[in-house]
Amino acid sequence: MERYLLVALGGALGSLLRYGLGALVQGSLGAGFPWSTLFVNALGSFLIGLTLRLSLEGALSGEARLFLAVGVLGGFTTFSSLSYETLALLQGGEVGKALLYAFGSLFLGLFLAFLGYRLGGALVG
């Protein structure tokens, strides 16, 4: 039961962080492109790579990994928003933006997850 509570609390925290940070980013960069989801998913990808490496190196307990990776980062990142916003761009006739957003999100996320993983290795030694 404790593990479920860790995931639930982490998910609530991650969702609140996504909402607040997303509003800040979108307000700063303006409408016309889903900057907030791109930013949040990119940051979350970096942090999941970092969390994975720290966990593999024994620097995080299993409970901390559940709280951070499954809870906080699971609530923080959002694939459903990426899908919705890509579809909205397509329906608006902005095919180029939609493709840039979808593929850019995927490649940026993978690249940042790799960087986070490498940073975790450097931090642990």
UniProtKB/Swiss-Prot annotation:
It is a multi-pass membrane protein. Na(+) binds at residues 74, 77. It is found in: Cell inner membrane. InterPro entries: FluC (IPR003691). It catalyses: fluoride(in) = fluoride(out). One of its GO terms (molecular function) is metal ion binding. The chain crosses the membrane at residues 5-25, 29-49, 66-86, 95-115. Na(+) is not transported, but it plays an essential structural role and its presence is essential for fluoride channel function. The keyword Nucleotide-binding does not apply. It comes from the Bacteria. Pfam families: CRCB. GO terms for cellular component: plasma membrane. Fluoride-specific ion channel. Important for reducing fluoride concentration in the cell, thus reducing its toxicity. Belongs to the fluoride channel Fluc/FEX (TC 1.A.43) family. This is Fluoride-specific ion channel FluC. It comes from Thermus thermophilus (strain ATCC 27634 / DSM 579 / HB8).
